[in-house]
């Protein structure tokens, strides 16, 4: 049994149930001004007042000024002494950890060292991995025992049985997936250039004007200057024959044209040579046939063997549309100094569809020219007879 000793110098303990009320301590004397404190000499008789803060060290780099401090000076009070070394059972105990939990040198981020965020993310990843493994282990259950014979292990299936077609047949699928072969996208992407005078379209194809559904008359630009109406008819016959052979399988309307006009330069034409203005007009019976000519010849070049020209064909919509409007316009036009009807606009009735391709120029009864032709006047050379002084 432990014996507790009492302190004989302790104050008596009051056992009364009544509360004891003691008089409050007297208030401290009012503070004395500094000038009065030093003038009366109280600083010499009594201890100087305590300094309002603790001074543990001083790093004064300025000179000392005596007029700023009283002659008696202030009492320098040092801070509390550092705690001594703690001993536990005669052995030096470890120092307590800092309040923040980690030493300052461990809170510093070194170059290349992981940050606090990296450490947290790695810990979360490890925890998630452990949870996933545990879930996989919990989800696995042994196969239930059946009353039938034990199942036998068979060899793995060969690679041929893993083919998509074989898998589809085993599953009873009616449609087997097969990679589609690259196909051409309709007639817009499948031009059929005529090999008579032109080559295949250049790559990339020049910008093409989109023809409207009502456009049947087109303007063929950048034609060789030596090309005549007969050459243009031969080119169109070959194109229509190719288009009709392709369209005959699908029941589409036939490609036919009923008017051709190659604008000639009458000042440069004579019996030895002919020269055009570089463009021609063609009217088709349907707008689809006009678009077919544009798809086939737009962006093509002329063959060097036929015409020594490097022009690129450009096909656009004409300003005047329709056969009737063209006949009225060309019928009122006068063509001065035109040597032959070959240079006039030609109207075909019935329309040409390429069935006579390769037969040469069309027969005269099938061609009707429109326009007023004025032949050139004969030139008479006047000679002067006599002596010239």
UniProtKB/Swiss-Prot annotation:
This is Protein MEI2-like 7. The keyword RNA-binding applies. The lineage of its organism: Eukaryota, Viridiplantae, Streptophyta, Embryophyta, Tracheophyta. InterPro entries: Mei2-like_Rrm_C, Nucleotide-bd_a/b_plait_sf, RBD_domain_sf, RRM_dom. Signal peptide: none annotated. It holds the Pfam family RRM_2. Residues 170-184 have a biased composition (Basic residues). The keyword RNA-binding applies. It comes from Oryza sativa subsp. japonica. It comes from the Eukaryota. Gene3D superfamilies: 3.30.70.330. GO terms for molecular function: RNA binding.
């Amino acid at each position: 049994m432990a014996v507790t000793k009492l302190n004989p110098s302790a104050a008596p303990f009051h056992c009364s149930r009544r509360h004891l009320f003691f008089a409050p301590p007297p208030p401290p004397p009012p503070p004395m001004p500094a000038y009065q404190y030093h003038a009366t000499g109280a600083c010499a008789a009594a201890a100087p007042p305590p300094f309002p803060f603790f001074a543990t060290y001083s790093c004064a780099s300025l000179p000392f000024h005596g007029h700023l401090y009283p002659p008696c000076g202030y009492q320098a009070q040092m801070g509390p002494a550092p705690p001594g070394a703690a001993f536990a059972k005669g052995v030096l105990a470890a120092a307590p950890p800092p309040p923040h939990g980690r030493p300052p040198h461990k809170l510093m981020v070194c170059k290349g060292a992981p940050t606090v965020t990296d450490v947290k993310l790695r810990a979360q990843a490890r925890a998630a991995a452990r949870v996933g493994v545990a879930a996989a282990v919990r989800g696995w259950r042994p196969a239930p025992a059946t009353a039938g014979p034990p199942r036998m292990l068979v060899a793995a299936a060969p690679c041929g049985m893993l083919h998509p077609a074989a898998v589809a047949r085993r599953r009873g699928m009616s449609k087997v997936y097969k990679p589609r072969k690259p196909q051409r996208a309709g007639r817009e992407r499948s031009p059929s250039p005529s090999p008579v005078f032109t080559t295949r379209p250049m790559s990339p194809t020049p910008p093409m004007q989109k023809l409207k559904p009502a456009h049947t008359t087109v303007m063929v630009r950048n034609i060789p200057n030596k090309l005549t109406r007969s050459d243009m008819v031969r080119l169109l016959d070959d194109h229509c024959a190719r288009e009709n052979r392709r369209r005959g399988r699908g029941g589409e309307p036939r490609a036919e044209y009923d008017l051709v006009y190659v604008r000639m330069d009458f000042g440069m034409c004579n019996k030895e040579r002919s020269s055009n203005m570089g463009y021609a007009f063609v009217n088709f019976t349907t707008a689809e046939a006009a678009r077919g000519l544009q798809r086939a010849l737009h962006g093509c070049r002329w063959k060097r063997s036929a015409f020594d020209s490097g022009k690129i064909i450009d096909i656009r919509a004409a300003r005047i549309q329709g056969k009737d409007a063209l006949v009225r316009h060309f019928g009122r036009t006068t063509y001065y100094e035109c040597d032959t009807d070959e240079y006039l606009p030609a109207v075909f009735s019935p329309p040409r569809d390429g069935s006579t391709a390769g037969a040469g120029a069309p027969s005269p009864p099938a061609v009707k020219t429109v326009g007023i032709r004025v032949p050139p006047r004969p030139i008479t050379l006047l000679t002067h007879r006599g002596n010239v002084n």
